[in-house]
From Swiss-Prot:
Localisation per UniProt entry: Golgi apparatus membrane
GO molecular function, one term: methyltransferase activity
Signal peptide (from-to): none
Record-level GO BP terms: methylation
This enzyme's EC code(s): 2.1.1.-
GO terms under cellular component: Golgi membrane; Golgi trans cisterna
Keyword Glycoprotein in annotation: yes
Positions glycosylated per UniProt: 54, 62, 125, 167, 288, 342, 411, 456, 592
Protein name: Probable methyltransferase PMT10
Domain of life (superkingdom): Eukaryota
TM regions (residue ranges): 16-36
Length: 655
């Protein structure tokens, strides 16, 4: 074999070809690296990289090994390339300076001046002065106490100027919401001599006089066994206008009249209209039935305030011209004992509102003089009531003494089989019976869902955790099973509340009246029940989100629709605990944060607690407002740890 042939074979070997290619690639890399390193500097990275000298040394080692086989080509002359021109000077347009604080030196683009006024009105009219400064970003002056005349102030129900402008009050318009344009800018003071409320269940029977210092009810209703004063306390014997011998005996009579009512099982959520001091609801609670007691403000002086001080679920509400703030098919039983409402006026529109809220198959219990007295005018009222209830397909199932009980049908079959032209008519198919925020009552019969939603809920306590069928009718963005969403929410809040009970010793708080400002499906309230805290929760569904209120009632809980840009319809000093989960991050573009927290303070009892779970970015502002109000406030990590984007602001209101 010739030597030249051997050399040719070596040149053709794949090994040599790879080595030459690698050497060429290495030289190209060095050239490019040197070229770009002259023009750019690299930002800091979260991980280390090797220096260029080390890379060069490694590449030179590879080149030397290749040179032993084939000679390297002569070095190429380095090209002289001028660096790229510097970028143009950037004009600072941000509102954050180099220290990360707000700056007053920035530029903005063109804008429409009118849009600024619209934005101000959209975020709420606040009379509380809030300041921005480069040093702290947000400041608020310490808030002062209101005048003593506002001790029992409910902003949207005590707007005397607006009420005086009403052209007509025949239907009770003066008792409806009329919110002032100017928001509250001070703190509601407690009455002189205010004490920490007596704890439940003792509060069912007695409360401190100084906490609700009003004697008119004693003067008006003392003879009916409602209430009496004993030294420094009000005492509640448990009677009422139609049940002088006590609410317990009255409830026994109802149970005997309607065995299927089964309080605490089939009948879990009830509504008591014109509740007096709420003895009916107070005694139903020991039968495992939660009763929402409602009455207008000051028909009898502060009756709802007495109910709340006793620890009974209650809310100021009136049957006038607008729908009440509860969804369709909310209550298994609706009760009216001498509630002084003319159910047959205006073609029965008020009873049609009761029908909207009454669950299919539910009971309407009416204890009134027309049921049992024989005066001509009362007998005429009874005949009108019988005629109206017959036309809306209610069945009179029992009349005994002064009590009459009707039952609502389970479906629409009776409605559609009525004679043509029978009034009231069925509501239009496109009517939403759960649309209640500032919506007028309608003179029509609310249709029942053809699929039976709302009628076939489980019995208590299983219904608390059984996803109701009406869950499928909620208008919401859901890409996975809605039942799984509800169950996941319940698991989440059970874990969270369990940690609150363990770490912050909630059982020592002796909570009774609780407000959840953004309730979702009611998971927070369900967790309180599961963990054995003897309290009731007012579950609020904000108008800005999905209307989950029907699901809350189907679970055996209670709540209402509300817009937190406006005050809530309750008395000052209502709640022991106010809970707000991600409320401010959702509402900050619509509402004034300071106004919301002032409203929270109005509703919070002295000695009460506020738990705000929200975005870390809002905590500084929320904490400053809390301190301006006078709360003791501290920010805490969640169970996700210190690096999570969520924090808990815990506040206490001093007595």
């Amino acid at each position: 074999m010739k030597l030249s042939d051997v050399g040719l074979d070596v040149v053709k070997t794949p090994r040599l070809v790879k080595l030459i290619a690698f050497a060429f690639l290495s030289i190209s890399t060095i050239f490019l690296f040197n070229h770009f390193s002259d023009s750019f500097s690299y930002p800091s990275l979260p991980f280390p990289i090797s220096s260029s000298s080390n890379v060069t040394e490694a590449i030179q080692t590879n080149i030397t090994s290749v040179a032993a086989v084939a000679p390297s080509p002569p070095p190429r002359p380095r090209l002289k390339i001028s660096p790229p021109p510097l970028p143009p000077t950037v004009v600072r347009t941000g509102i954050i300076n180099e220290n990360g604080a707000m700056s007053d030196s920035f530029e903005i683009g063109g804008f429409d001046p009118d849009s600024i006024d619209e934005l101000k009105s959209a975020t709420g009219n606040s009379s509380v002065e809030e300041k921005e400064s480069p040093e702290v970003g947000f400041q608020i002056e310490k808030l002062k106490l209101c005048d003593k005349t506002k001790i029992d102030y409910i902003p949207c129900l005590d707007n005397e100027e607006e009420i005086k402008r009403l052209n007509n009050t025949d239907r009770g318009e003066n008792y409806e919401r009329h919110c002032p344009k100017q928001s509250l800018d001070c703190l509601i003071p407690p009455p002189d001599g205010y004490k920490k409320p007596i704890q439940w269940p003792q509060s069912r029977d007695k409360i401190w006089f100084n906490n609700v210092p009003h004697t008119r009810l004693v003067e008006d209703k003392g003879g009916q066994n409602w209430i009496r004063r004993e030294k420094d306390k009000f005492v509640f014997p448990g009677g009422g206008t139609q049940f002088i011998h006590g609410a317990d005996q009255y409830l026994d009579q109802i149970s005997q009249m309607i065995p299927d009512i089964t309080f605490g099982s089939r009948t879990r959520v009830a509504l008591d209209i014109g509740c007096g001091v709420a003895s009916f609801g107070a005694f139903l609670m020991q039968r495992n039935t939660t009763t929402l007691s409602v009455a207008p403000k000051d028909v009898h002086e502060n009756q709802i305030q007495f109910a709340l001080e006793r620890g009974v679920p209650a809310m100021v509400a009136v049957f006038a011209t607008r729908r009440l703030l509860y969804p369709s098919q909310s209550f298994e039983m609706i009760h009216c004992s001498r509630c002084r409402i003319n159910w047959t006026r205006d073609d029965g529109i008020l009873l049609l509102e009761v029908n909207r809220m009454l669950r299919a198959g539910g009971y309407f219990v009416w204890a009134a003089q027309p049921v049992y007295k024989h005066e001509d005018n009362l007998q005429e009222q009874w005949k009108e009531m019988l005629d109206l209830t017959n036309r809306i397909c209610w069945e009179l199932i029992k009349k005994e003494g002064y009590i009459a009980v009707w039952r609502k049908p389970l479906n629409n079959s009776c409605y559609v089989s009525r004679e043509a032209g029978t009034k009231p008519p069925l509501c239009r198919p496109d009517d939403d019976p759960d649309d209640v925020w500032y919506v007028d009552m309608k003179p029509c019969i609310t249709r029942l869902p053809d699929n039976g939603y709302g009628a076939n809920v489980s019995t208590w306590p299983a219904r608390l955790h059984d996803p109701p069928e009406r869950l499928q009718s909620i208008q919401m963005d859901a890409y996975i099973s809605r039942k799984e969403i509800m169950k996941a929410e319940s698991r989440f809040w059970l874990e969270v509340v369990e940690s609150y009970v363990r770490v912050f010793r909630w059982k020592e708080f002796k909570l009774r009246n609780v407000l959840d400002m953004r309730a979702g499906f009611g998971g927070f309230a369900a967790a309180l029940n599961d963990l054995g805290l003897d309290c009731w929760v007012m579950n609020i569904v904000p108008v800005s989100g999905f209307n989950t209120l029907p699901v809350i009632y189907d679970r055996g809980l209670q709540g209402a629709m509300h817009d937190w840009c406006e005050p809530f319809d309750t008395y000052p000093r209502t709640y022991d605990l106010i809970h707000a989960a991600f409320l401010f991050s959702v509402e900050k573009k619509r509402c004034n944060i300071t106004n919301i927290m002032l409203e929270m303070d109005r509703m919070l009892r002295p000695g009460g607690h506020v738990y705000i779970r929200d975005s870390l970015s809002l905590m500084d502002q929320l904490q400053q407002v809390a301190k301006a109000i006078g709360w003791t406030a501290g920010v805490h990590d969640t169970g996700e740890g210190p690096h999570a984007s969520v924090r808990i602001l815990i506040c206490d209101k001093r007595i």
